[in-house]
Amino acid sequence: MAMLNDTIYALSSGAPPSGVSVIRVSGTLTRDILFQLVGSVPAARTASYRTIRTRYDQPVDSGLVLFFPGPNSFTGEDAAELQIHGSKAVLAALFRELGDIPGVRMAMEGEFSRRAFENGKLDLVEVEGLADLIGAETEMQRRLAVEQSAGGVSAIYDSWAERLTRARALIEAELDFPDEDDVPGSVSDMVWADMARLRHDIALHLEAASAGEIIRDGFKVVIAGAPNAGKSSLMNALAKREVAIVTDIAGTTRDVLHVDLDIDGYLVKLYDTAGLREAEDRVEIEGVRRARVALRDADLVLLLVDMSNPIIPADLEQALPHVTVGTKKDLIETASDRYDLQISTTTGEGLPELRDLIGRVVKERYGGQSLAIPSRQRHKDSLAKCLAALDAAISQGSANLELRTEQLRLAAEYLGRITGRVDVEQLLDVIFSEFCIGK
């Protein structure tokens, strides 16, 4: 990122108007800025009530000013926060003053966090956890983000990297000093036994990645069935608002509709699909095609069957995993045991039980485990490459020790790419672009 030596500023709180706005400043000119705006530098990490003035001594506003000397700040640089009234006019006036100071500019997306990374205050996993915490909408997303941003996952990767480094050091010592008494005997046996245990630990960790992805990106539930089975009515009932158009005309839904739900702290992505049948209308044919794609990608299928006219499309007879839901219970007199659950969107009967069932399915598959798990595809990719390098090192028992040691070096490098301990310059712009300006 260019201009890392500039001093930067940005609004780090919500958009105005608001009761209070927080302006964040970071860089070598922070002290000079405070002298110009409030007349002096407040005591470190102490809130001081000050009047903020222009260079012409005109008051802009009054508020709390805090100074954080580097390296003991979020960014590792001298930094400050100005807590002022959240008026658009007040912010515009303050930004004019800041923008007119040479060497001071508005921050770019994620630049405060980028500087924290560059100055060793955060690693990449912690940065991503912070971004996820800011964007968290469910309780499980919050918990996962806290685990990542607090360094719990990074500590695991660092400990694994240390084991790889020690293994390489012991092997190289044996290669360089084969006759020295202070090199432990049978070092190869010790190293490869530990590497086998490490491989097992990483494999188990990688298996948990699906839980991290579900918590972060959502558990996909697809509502499917024949036309007029009540799919759109169920989506509207679970969303508690009108997401889909509901009519008595078969084939009303032509596209895949989507709504996010919070069920027991998990993000559940609910999809309403076109009724599955042999369609002739070109638009409906495309809708049915998209419905089949959604079914293929689903974590759970709710197979809806109109109990007053039970039809199960052939596409859905073998759909797994699925829950068979009988609909329009208010229109039948005799209950049937062929359904996992029976509901009526008209009366609301069975809807709480359906929400509970979805929650149980998610928790049975992904709950009850540590949240120190991979949460992003790039984590999975690097862990898989690390595992492959370890496999190569362990399995090539007859190979030259130097070649096997090189595989251990590659395994450590892939781990380092997750946290940013090794060169990941090409990743940084992508990662930090996820932040808003003031973070």
UniProtKB/Swiss-Prot annotation:
GO terms for biological process: tRNA methylation; tRNA wobble uridine modification. Its EC number is 3.6.-.-. K(+) binds at residues 228, 247, 249, 252. GTP binds at residues 228-233, 247-253, 272-275. This is tRNA modification GTPase MnmE. The keyword Hydrolase applies. Homodimer. Heterotetramer of two MnmE and two MnmG subunits. (6S)-5-formyl-5,6,7,8-tetrahydrofolate binds at residues 24, 81, 121, 439. Its cofactor is K(+). Mg(2+) binds at residues 232, 253. InterPro entries: G_TrmE (IPR031168), GTP-bd (IPR006073), GTP-bd_TrmE_N (IPR018948), GTPase_MnmE (IPR004520), MnmE_dom2 (IPR027368), MnmE_helical (IPR025867), P-loop_NTPase (IPR027417), Small_GTP-bd (IPR005225). It is found in: Cytoplasm. Keywords: Cytoplasm, GTP-binding, Hydrolase, Magnesium, Metal-binding, Nucleotide-binding, Potassium, tRNA processing. GO terms for molecular function: GTP binding; GTPase activity; metal ion binding. Binds 1 potassium ion per subunit. It holds the Pfam family MMR_HSR1. Its main location: cytoplasm. Belongs to the TRAFAC class TrmE-Era-EngA-EngB-Septin-like GTPase superfamily. TrmE GTPase family. One of its GO terms (cellular component) is cytoplasm.
